């Protein structure tokens, strides 16, 4: 009964299956954690969704910003960009079933026994674990409701970028969505910077990667995240694991087996026949 954590798949179905074969993943006894961004950019978003949905209770995933963008495209709110390669998925006979399943997935996974917290972009230093759970539930509730297109329509935007318990309504939901799915850098006070996407060594002062600021989670918890491919899985504190290693850009798909902290990789096949 092993726990496998894999970074952003981005439609790289062949790589995902080969990586799972490499570790002898067994859905009847193992658990697969995915850091979000299942879809877009890679060639096989449809097959990725069909496969991960079929895993049932063996799967623990979180939504990423590209997954949310797919919901927007499906609801005819966001633009379908050719570079995202979503047409096959959107035109599939089971598109409604798959996308409605996707929008009912969480933004945050917490395993209190294994002391694991997973979110696509990470956990903002301005939140403790209870606040993160509460904010995730709020966004999940609106995404899984029939009124989710109204939220998607108001989701885009960089403000507010500073957490306050007094935030309400759409501004509160937008902050939470940005923190869970888009965050990279923070100011020293924990305020989000939604502009800089450079590698940490090129980021302007006083910005710091969110994981380099003190967080409010219990000391014995580990944070798993994806989203930030240019990190190449490096440069994080000991108990924070960056698993997006840019498979869809020609990098590798990375898997961490939790029990022995062993890494496995599958090089990108995206540009191969």
Curated annotation (Swiss-Prot):
Keywords linked to the UniProt accession: Hydrolase
InterPro entries: ApaH, Calcineurin-like_PHP_ApaH, Metallo-depent_PP-like
Catalytic activity, EC: 3.6.1.41
Substrates-to-products reaction catalysed: P(1),P(4)-bis(5'-adenosyl) tetraphosphate + H2O = 2 ADP + 2 H(+)
Cell wall biogenesis/degradation listed as a keyword: no
GO molecular function: bis(5'-nucleosyl)-tetraphosphatase (symmetrical) activity
Functional note: Hydrolyzes diadenosine 5',5'''-P1,P4-tetraphosphate to yield ADP.
Protein name from the UniProt record: Bis(5'-nucleosyl)-tetraphosphatase, symmetrical
Native organism: Proteus mirabilis (strain HI4320)
Gene: apaH
